[in-house]
Structure formats: structure tokens, C-alpha cells
């Protein structure tokens, strides 16, 4: 029995898969093919009409994960049937995750919606092409938060297995599961913590230490470049982000080449202020081809940093598919932080989303 039929008490409407009672996922999200525009619109009309026939007294809320700012065809069609649509971005600085404030918003809204109208409301999940990696994380978060599935790693893997083999690799050049699991563990703490999420700490990201040199060239070495993306906590720009740090911007001298034969440890000084959701990328500069190759990526939230250090091995990093052999046994990346006492911890930023409130959101 697959995960999406585990709570299957009756046949769901055509075009939908049942995740839980009155919670459905559009089956187009699992397709590897592009549905022609005309067929796609017909498909949406038929699905929503059948839903209305099956649940005539229900209100419908659809979470849509998409790219861009324009109103989507999905939203335009669902509005015709008096449904409420909430649009979310399908990535955060290239990582198929949402910032913690949006995850909190999603959990709160879905919970309130399902509890409304004497538990008659219906929740729908939809993603536009390319949005499956994030949708898989969102579905796992929903299952963990509502205690419909246990074990963060097992739940995340089970949801990803529902998609056709190779879909995740097709849509994401890096394996996003390590960062997704980290954020799923954040979500799981909501069920046991009286304050969730905790205040986002303002920290100084002091340095990154690589222990045992990964092999990214013919000399078993690398020229590491660090880039850091996040929210500028000195502005009132809400969820907007930008590059906070880049090795290339800071250093005018040529990047140093580190080889396994010469050293065991690389220490890269950064001294960058961070707060909230942060994406840290480490790239290798290949001088032969004059291009940058992604070594690893990690996304984290400063609210959950303990003892001012984030310790990661190859299993905890988002890396290119089939590249684990580049990281020797015992490889470790350490991200060291310092306190920034001049800035007070703040709550997550105000969430501003594209929402059509037909009937109003809770």
C-alpha cells in the first residue's frame, strides 16, 4: 500500500490522490511530461467539478507552489469555482524549501482550514512544473505535523518514492534531501516545543572549516568559493533575500588551491552577519574550464543553531548526484558562529503572499 492511499476510505475524485481525509494532491504533480495547455485546463475543470459534486457543502483551499509573480492559470480556473488559492514560491535561493515563516504560515492555515465548518473543508495541493521537490517536502511536513506519519527521514523518503523514478534528479541538480530533512526536524519540534519557532538569533558567521580535502580536480584538491544568501535583517524587506557574502567579492588575490597531499584542513574566514533562513554554498573554481562547480549547499535557520556551531558530514550536505566519492572518509564541514550582541533576536518576518480570499483565510 502506497503512502498516498494509506488513508484511502473511498475512491478519490479522478485526477487526485488522497493524502488524508479531505486532503488531496493533484496527480499532475507526479507527471514527467508537460500537459498541453488546452488539456491541462480541461483537466482542472473536470477535477474541480467532480470535487464539488462529491463535497457540495465544503469550501476548498488550494496550496499552489509556483515560480513568478503573475497569477497562474491554476489560480484563475479555481477562482471560477469559488476556491481559495494560496501561492507559495517553489524555492528559496535555489533550494527547494520555504523559509521557516512560510512553513509556519502553511501549517497554521491548513490546520485552521481543516478544523473549520465542522471539519467539512477540503485542502488541495498543487505544484506547477518543476515544483515537485518542494511539494514533496511540504507533504512530509503536513504528515509529520498532524502526526499522520512518524519518523522524519522515513516520511520524507516515503513521499519522494511516490514520484516516478528519476523525477527528483531531473528537477534538482543537487540532492536536496539533507536540507529538507533538517527543516523537517525543525517542523517536528513544533509538536513538543511550547514556543515554535524560537526567536531567530542574529549571529556572526565567522568561518567555514573543511576537514579532509574533497577531490574536485585532477590533483585531488579544490579552490573553494563560499557564497552566503539570506535576509538583510537591517531592512524591512520582509521575505526578500540577497547575497550577503562571496569569497570572490572579498578577495582580490587568486583563489588558493588546496590539495590532499599538502594539507588536511581548510579554514575560510567569512565574518558575515546572518539571521533567520540562510543558504550557504561552497563551489570549486575550475581554472581549466573557467567555470564554477557546486561542491555542496546547506540551508539552515539560525534559531536552531546550538553551541554556535553547525557540524556536517557528506550525508548532511546537499551535493551533486553521484558525487559522494569526491568526499574522502571522515570529511567534515564545520560552520562556526559568534554572538552578535548589538542586534536583538527577532521573530520571523511578516509573511506576505498572493492570496485570493474568497470566503477568507483563517
Where are each of the predicted segments found?
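Hydrophobic or amphipathic alpha-helical targeting/insertion segments
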Residues: 129-134
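Phosphate/adenylate-binding glycine loop and adjacent helical scaffold
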Residues: 126
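Catalytic cores of secreted or luminal carbohydrate-active enzymes
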Residues: 167-203
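Activation on folded, globular domain regions of eukaryotic proteins
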Residues: 161-162
Amino acid at each position: 500500500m502506497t503512502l498516498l492511499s494509506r488513508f484511502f476510505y473511498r475512491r478519490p475524485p479522478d485526477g487526485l490522490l488522497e493524502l488524508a481525509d479531505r486532503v488531496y494532491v493533484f496527480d499532475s504533480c507526479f507527471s514527467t511530461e508537460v500537459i498541453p495547455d488546452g488539456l491541462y485546463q480541461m483537466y482542472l475543470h473536470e477535477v474541480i467539478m467532480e470535487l464539488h459534486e462529491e463535497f457540495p457543502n465544503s469550501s476548498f483551499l488550494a496550496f499552489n507552489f509556483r515560480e513568478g509573480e503573475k497569477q497562474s492559470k491554476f489560480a484563475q480556473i479555481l477562482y471560477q469555482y469559488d476556491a481559495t488559492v494560496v501561492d507559495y514560491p517553489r524555492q528559496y535561493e535555489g533550494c527547494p524549501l520555504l523559509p521557516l515563516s512560510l512553513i509556519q504560515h502553511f501549517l497554521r492555515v491548513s490546520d485552521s482550514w481543516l478544523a473549520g465548518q465542522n471539519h467539512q473543508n477540503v485542502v488541495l495541493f498543487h505544484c506547477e512544473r518543476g515544483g515537485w521537490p518542494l511539494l514533496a517536502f511540504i507533504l512530509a511536513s503536513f504528515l509529520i505535523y498532524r502526526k499522520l506519519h512518524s519518523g522524519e527521514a522515513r516520511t520524507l523518503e516515503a513521499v519522494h518514492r511516490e514520484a516516478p523514478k528519476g523525477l527528483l534528479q531531473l528537477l534538482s541538480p543537487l540532492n536536496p534531501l539533507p536540507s529538507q530533512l533538517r527543516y523537517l526536524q525543525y517542523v517536528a519540534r513544533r509538536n513538543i516545543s511550547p514556543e515554535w519557532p524560537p526567536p531567530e538569533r542574529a549571529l556572526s558567521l565567522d568561518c567555514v572549516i573543511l576537514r579532509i580535502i574533497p577531490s574536485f580536480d585532477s590533483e585531488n584538491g579544490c579552490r573553494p568559493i563560499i557564497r552566503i544568501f539570506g535576509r538583510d535583517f537591517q531592512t524591512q524587506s520582509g521575505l526578500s533575500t540577497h547575497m550577503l557574502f562571496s569569497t570572490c567579492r572579498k578577495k582580490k588575490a587568486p583563489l588558493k588551491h588546496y590539495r590532499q597531499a599538502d594539507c588536511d584542513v581548510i579554514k575560510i574566514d567569512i565574518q558575515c552577519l546572518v539571521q533567520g533562513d540562510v543558504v550557504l554554498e561552497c563551489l570549486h573554481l575550475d581554472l581549466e574550464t573557467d567555470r564554477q562547480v557546486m561542491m555542496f549547499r546547506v540551508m539552515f535557520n539560525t534559531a536552531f543553531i546550538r553551541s554556535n556551531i553547525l557540524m556536517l558530514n557528506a550525508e548532511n550536505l546537499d551535493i551533486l548526484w553521484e558525487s559522494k566519492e569526491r568526499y574522502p572518509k571522515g570529511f567534515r564541514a564545520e560552520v562556526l558562529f559568534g554572538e552578535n550582541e548589538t542586534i536583538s533576536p527577532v521573530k520571523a518576518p511578516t509573511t506576505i503572499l498572493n492570496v485570493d480570499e474568497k470566503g477568507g483565510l483563517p
